[in-house]
Regions:
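Phosphopantetheine carrier-protein modules
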Residues: 14-33, 50-59
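Thiotemplate assembly-line natural product biosynthesis machinery
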Residues: 3-24, 72-77
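AMP-binding/adenylate-forming catalytic domain of the ANL superfamily
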Residues: 57-68
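Phosphopantetheine-attachment site and its flanking helix in carrier
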Residues: 31-48
Length: 77
């Protein structure tokens, strides 16, 4: 699968398109998101990578930062 850095930039671009007001460089990403933002992220990543993400994946740890989102996607591939 894709190199971590390449995947991180791909995911950043995708998520900035659907959630332009969110700072994806933050290490406190989860605190910036409401439930709609969390759902949008999970659906966007599920569709883009053909993986299954659900409410059990929507943890503060998984949504802490862009790096943790990339790790989550890679763990499902």
């Amino acid at each position: 699968f894709k190199n971590f850095i390449v995947m991180k930039e791909d995911i950043r671009k995708m998520l900035e398109d659907v959630l332009p007001l969110v700072n994806f460089d933050s290490d406190f990403l989860f605190s910036e998101l409401d439930s709609l933002g969390v759902t949008t992220i999970l659906m966007t990543l599920s569709d883009a990578y053909g993986i299954t993400l659900d409410a059990t994946d929507a943890t503060p740890r998984n949504l802490r930062s862009l790096d943790s989102l990339v790790a989550l996607v890679q763990s499902k591939l």
